[in-house]
């Protein structure tokens, strides 16, 4: 998205309020001219679930990520691509492409391993945005997900739950939904590309509300993400 700014210049449309400047202070910038400001209106964070459930799709998924990133770079929309997974109690983020990177080849380094603790992933991307928000005020986070958060590391005991809980099923879905709400409360737009079974579709709705689109095959990822980005662009013009 581009904004057009009116600036003073030595050619263009005469600004009658500035004619005096040419004679008295030898300033010839007495015309209105227009400059395209290529400042983007929003940034995109593409968050790729890299848990072991994606193992059979990892090459195709990486290729789709490259397609999305290249398209956004060509449109001058800053995009960051991050893979996440949970291993031995830690959620690991690997930034495959930063906002500054023009090349997208590192996205091919995507690989799948471990678990997916989605709630912690959303909290983490919020921290990453706090540290490096990019050049725009608005932010769109798009996650590729199966809407089935799962981790071998249990939720620790607490006053409400003295024995703790497995991080799975309703517990993990509610945790992810809570973190999505927290991001949205900060003004961050969160959408999902969902690829999973019918049972998980209900979980996707609990976590993302109506802000998700479903795909049946991994090679549909780029088109689905494109629709979500187009929706964001349309919301900017309202």
Enumerate the language-model features and the residues they cover.
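Acidic, glycine-rich A-domain
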Residues: 1-238
């Amino acid at each position: 998205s581009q904004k057009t700014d009116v600036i003073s210049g030595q050619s263009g449309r005469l600004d009658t309020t500035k004619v005096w400047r040419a004679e008295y202070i030898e300033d010839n910038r007495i015309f209105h001219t227009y400059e395209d400001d290529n400042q983007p209106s929003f940034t995109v964070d593409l968050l790729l679930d890299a848990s072991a459930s994606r193992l059979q799709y990892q090459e195709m998924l990486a290729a789709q990520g490259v397609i999305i990133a290249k398209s956004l770079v060509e449109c001058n929309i800053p995009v960051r691509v991050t893979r996440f997974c949970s291993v031995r109690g830690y959620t690991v983020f690997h930034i495959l492409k930063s906002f500054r990177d023009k090349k997208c080849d590192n996205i091919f380094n995507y690989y799948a391993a471990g678990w997916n603790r989605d709630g912690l992933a959303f909290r983490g991307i919020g921290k990453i945005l706090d540290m490096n928000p990019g050049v725009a005020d608005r932010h769109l986070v798009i996650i590729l997900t199966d809407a089935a958060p799962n981790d071998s590391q249990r939720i620790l005991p607490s006053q409400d739950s003295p024995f703790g809980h497995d991080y799975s099923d309703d517990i993990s879905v509610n945790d992810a939904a809570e973190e999505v709400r927290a991001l949205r409360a900060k003004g961050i737009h969160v959408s999902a590309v969902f690829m999973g079974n019918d049972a998980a579709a209900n979980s996707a709705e609990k976590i993302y509300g109506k802000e998700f689109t479903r795909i049946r095959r991994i090679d549909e990822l780029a088109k689905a993400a494109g629709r979500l980005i187009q929706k964001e662009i349309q919301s900017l013009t309202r």
